[in-house]
Design a protein with these regions (language model features):
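Short acidic/glycine-rich loops and adjacent helix/strand connectors
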Residues: 1-187
Length: 187
């Protein structure tokens, strides 16, 4: 935090981050100031569609309203998984195990997920900033470690599946996360 002597205005240099999850199940958004969660919501709360996978525009608007900010105040948007790595798993798994690929479903997934940055900019026209694409298990680790009171922690992520990883072990120290080992699909 800085105080500008000329204006006595306080400037907070802590980044404001909008996290987005969509196009799979349980679309949601969360707004953070640094590592503090300011607001979070799942899209189904607003649409009343169970497991809603659409772009979480209502959740985003809710988070912005709760934090009393607009898209121009957002320093970074984070997306929860690396689509190209997930595409690699889906394509190779289906290619190896399915005699008849559902090309339509794969195309729809390809169109929305692999072009997620375009989708975000299209749906959030006022946002001109950066987009961070994070590995799925790193997203889980960050969501648990950063808001915790711990400066150091062992991290274990047990998940149905991320891009390829089903289980990941790592560590968090201060503001750093390191994933050390993973068990990959299909094992």
């Amino acid at each position: 935090m800085e105080v500008h002597k000329e204006t006595d205005q306080i400037t907070d240099n802590t980044p404001t981050i909008l996290g987005i999850s969509c196009f799979y199940h349980d679309s949601s958004a969360a707004l953070l100031k640094g590592t503090e969660i300011i607001a979070a919501a799942q899209e189904e709360r607003f649409t009343r569609k169970k497991f809603d996978k659409s772009f979480p525009i209502e959740s985003i608007l809710f988070c912005l309203d709760q934090a009393k900010v607009n898209l121009k105040d957002i320093d970074l948007i984070a997306f929860y998984e690396e689509p190209i790595l997930k595409w690699d798993r889906i394509y190779n798994t289906n290619l190896n195990y399915s005699r008849k690929l559902n090309i339509g479903k794969l195309f729809n997934w390809f169109n929305s997920k692999l072009r997620i940055e375009d989708e975000i900019y299209k749906n959030l026209k006022d946002y001109k900033g950066k987009i961070l694409i994070s590995q799925h298990h790193l997203s889980h680790a960050a969501s648990a470690f950063y808001p915790s009171p711990f400066k150091e922690s062992t991290i274990v992520v047990l998940d149905g599946i991320g891009e390829w990883a089903c289980t990941t072990i790592g560590k968090g120290i201060d503001n750093r996360l390191e994933l050390l080992a993973e068990q990959r699909f299909p094992n």
